[in-house]
């Protein structure tokens, strides 16, 4: 899947729930963005896959293209922490619900032509 009006940030991110759901996704940014995300996380292990789905789509339904969760509190409060796995070490990390850059293979969250 190409990024169409978006630009690929030049890496893949693997989403896992620890069991069966593993997916390689093009990580894109809109052409209007100045840079790519600055985290170095390559593998992200979510406590619960369905929780990630709910959180992600809830994020997409928020008003505007740029929506952030508040200091690590997911869009579904109290649902539990999101764990990033980096270098085989699990650690809590602020959930980024920004809808642009977007995960183009999951949903198109940027306005066409922007």
From Swiss-Prot:
The UniProt GO MF terms for this protein read:
ion channel regulator activity; toxin activity
Q: Does the keyword Disulfide bond apply?
A: yes
Is Membrane given among the entry's keywords?
no
Annotated localization: Secreted
**How would you describe the post-translational modification of this protein?**
Contains 6 disulfide bonds.
State the GO CC annotations.
extracellular region
- Keywords of this entry: Disulfide bond, Ion channel impairing toxin, Neurotoxin, Secreted, Toxin
Q: In which tissues is it expressed?
A: Expressed by the venom duct.
Q: Which domain of life is it from?
A: Eukaryota
Name this polypeptide is given: Turripeptide OL22
Q: Which organism is it from?
A: Iotyrris olangoensis (Sea snail)
């Amino acid at each position: 899947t190409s990024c169409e009006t978006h630009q690929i940030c030049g890496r893949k991110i693997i989403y896992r729930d620890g069991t069966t759901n593993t997916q390689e996704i093009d990580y894109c940014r809109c052409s209007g963005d100045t840079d790519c995300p600055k985290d170095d996380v390559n593998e992200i292990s979510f406590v619960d896959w369905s929780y990630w789905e709910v959180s992600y789509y809830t994020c997409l339904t928020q008003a505007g293209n740029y929506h952030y969760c508040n200091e690590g509190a997911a869009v579904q409060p109290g649902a539990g922490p999101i764990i990033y796995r980096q270098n085989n070490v699990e650690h809590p990390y602020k959930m980024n619900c920004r809808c642009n850059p977007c995960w183009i293979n999951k949903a198109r969250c940027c306005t066409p032509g922007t």
